[in-house]
Amino acid sequence: MSASVAEPPPALSRKAEFKAAKAELLARFKSANHVTPLMHALSRATDDALRSLWQECGLPATLALVAVGGFGRGELSPHSDVDILVLLPDAHASELDERIERFIGMAWDLGLEIGSSVRTVGQCIEEASHDVTVQTSLLEARRIVGSTALFERFMLRYREALDARAFFQAKVLEMRQRHAKFQDTPYSLEPNVKESPGGLRDLQTILWIARAAGFGSSWRELDTRGLITDREARELRRNEGFLKTLRARLHVIAGRRQDILVFDLQTQAAESFGYQPTSAKRASEQLMRRYYWAAKAVTQLATILIQNIEAQLFPATSGVTRVLSPGRFVEKQGMLEIAADDVFERHPDAILEAFLLYEATRGVKGLSARTLRALYNSRDVMNNAWRRDPRNRRTFMQILQQPEGITHAFRLMNQTSVLGRYLLNFRRIVGQMQHDLYHVYTVDQHILMVLRNIRRFAVAEHAHEYPFCSQLIVNFERPWVLYVAALFHDIAKGRGGDHSALGMADARRFCREHGIEGDDAALVVWLVQHHLTMSQVAQKQDTSDPVVIKRFAELVGSERRLTALYLLTVADIRGTSPKVWNTWKGKLLEDLYRATLAVLGGAQPDAHSELKTRQEEALALLRLETVPPDAHRALWDQLDVGYFLRHDAADIAWQTRVLYRHVAADTAIVRARPSPVGDALQVLVYVKDRSDLFAGICAYFDRNGLSVLDARVNTTRHGYALDNFIVTQTEHDVQYRDIANLVEQQLAARLAESAPLPEPSKGRLSRLSRTFPITPRVDLRADERGQYYILSVSANDRPGLLYSIARVLAEHRVGVHAARINTLGERVEDVFMLDGTGLSDNRLQIQVETELLRAIAV
């Protein structure tokens, strides 16, 4: 008796065969540099499979199976949707419906991601007239199998109904709306290769518009038509090829449709292109820079092409032109137009003049397609001789010194690559991503954001945003000095070494070449060198210490330098990420500014006089609150000088009013209120001190989703802790007034318990932190006076991190005197002042540092 092996069902066999054929194609693609052959091969294989299913389902020859969308173009990425149209004759038997459903179901069973529609010719035309998306997908329709006559009749009706002008307007509006979803920038941390500005969809949109207008359906045809030049066509093909290849590789790596270049895939995608990490740049950073350059070129060329197509579709009536620069520029319909195509070749100094005129001429809203094209094709003119030309250096300084339009001018100079060709070191940081968990913009975009922020300080309409900064810049002479410092403060990022020192050398050279001399040049160079200093002092040092203020004042040296550094620092922090700036950081910086200004004005940083002033101000506030005279003494007699120096008069008055009747309280007193300095909750805790108190409070905040921004810990002479916290709720939109009572009750109840400290929860890291973890660092050392120990911690941010640190300190009976919690996007750089008599023992120090590193490890 012979054994027999059962044949697999036909559906399973078909699926296995198709899957094997597709796998073979993808395997070949892994070693190929170009994706177009793969896309065409996948499309052909899908055509063959669908034809086979069509015939198997016995669908009649009177119907037609039509590929639409990207499948219609004959281009399929590895896991793209397969969009098909089953085209029906006007009169058809109803029993066909069952066979069509079977066909579509079998296509799904084959493993195809089918997007299907079943319509007559009339229904297609009707649907397309109401929906530009349908109209677009039908534009590239291609017959796979079935009635040729029906398909040709459909295409004839479609072309007759297509209004090229209306289609142009609809697609341009659609593109603008799509760009708005991505904040109108290609420089996203995780760009969508297909949909983001400068992505594949922009290129497809141009070809759709051109095809609808009858101008051609390829870059070669648009070149022949005169809409683009040979050089532009080559650039478009090159960048289109890169974007298509990148998208296909994302699909292969992810094993599914994946158009977003997420952090998790950036390294693998980079390696698939052959990028290798260097000491200065990760492989992923090199890939992202290539992507941003491609997206930038696509954006620039798309602008030119769309304007050119618009000019063909909507010929302008001969409007009035205004001469702006004889023989060089005119204004035409609100756009800056070159007087002749070879203006930049004949007059290279006109290149920067174009941006000066755009910036300074009212009524000019942009550069015309003709001007943009001339700039794009004049890159060879922008050489060393052009950079050294004194006329260009004067014009560049004029652009910086205009009363308005500076931000727009510099953005346009960057978009057209002129800025990077004039400042070669700027070109090196265009499209350079910073995977420091802090900046969310590329270096060039961050620099321009900082420039924009400084400009906004000086614009009256934005004075309400940062009133103090606006007040300072009004009286700041020659504010263009700040703009130069902004341009150079991060220009040396990614070179290796200290970017502040390298940038300082670049800034000094720029000043020398552009006639910036004396105090102005010295200020620019000094600002670039010290652009991080004020932030570090305000957020990491004890600014209640007169010695800290005196040392910072000595570094600054003058009110002009202090004001310049303050304005640059605020603009810099605000230009890193929408999440990094908060009102608490603003208060720290403003307090440091005012304290330093007083010292520069001749005031001596004397602790005794400062203490007396704050006490007098606090007493005045208490009188307004009708607190009895001398009622404060019971509490104040238990407080040391440090308490009065670390708190302002308003906080001292509030805490005194709450506590003066309860100086010897038996139970914990907890009071909370919306923070006077911004969107946060201020929490006061007064209770008999114990070694695990700080950790216990942090445990409560952690369990309730409250992040600590600042902690000021005080111990009274009679053994009570008087601790003050500033906390925020970042996960949910919350009204702090509404949760104040709940925090008071819950935290007081938690402190009344004698339960041991809970195990810290290792909160989930963000995808960015998981992909680009930083090496945790712990540094523990005695301060200059030997009074406290300073603990500095740097790590990936995650829920529960502060409590993990506090618990280790509590286990070793190390008291926390003060804490500065500095969250920078996805990373933290926290500083603690510790009371730890035992820390003088080196073995204990090493043990604490080791356990802290273990606690903060990812």
From Swiss-Prot:
- InterPro entries for the chain: ACT-like_dom_sf, ACT_dom, HD/PDEase_dom, HD_domain, NT_sf, PII_UdlTrfase/GS_AdlTrfase, Polymerase_NTP_transf_dom, UTase/UR
Q: What is the lineage of its organism?
A: Bacteria, Pseudomonadati, Pseudomonadota, Betaproteobacteria, Burkholderiales
Q: What is this protein called?
A: Bifunctional uridylyltransferase/uridylyl-removing enzyme
Originating organism = Burkholderia pseudomallei (strain K96243)
Q: Which reaction does it catalyse?
A: [protein-PII]-L-tyrosine + UTP = [protein-PII]-uridylyl-L-tyrosine + diphosphate; [protein-PII]-uridylyl-L-tyrosine + H2O = [protein-PII]-L-tyrosine + UMP + H(+)
Q: Which coenzymes or cofactors are required?
A: Mg(2+)
Q: How does its record describe regulation of its activity?
A: Uridylyltransferase (UTase) activity is inhibited by glutamine, while glutamine activates uridylyl-removing (UR) activity.
Its EC number is: 2.7.7.59, 3.1.4.-
Protein purpose: Modifies, by uridylylation and deuridylylation, the PII regulatory proteins (GlnB and homologs), in response to the nitrogen status of the cell that GlnD senses through the glutamine level. Under low glutamine levels, catalyzes the conversion of the PII proteins and UTP to PII-UMP and PPi, while under higher glutamine levels, GlnD hydrolyzes PII-UMP to PII and UMP (deuridylylation). Thus, controls uridylylation state and activity of the PII proteins, and plays an important role in the regulation of nitrogen assimilation and metabolism.
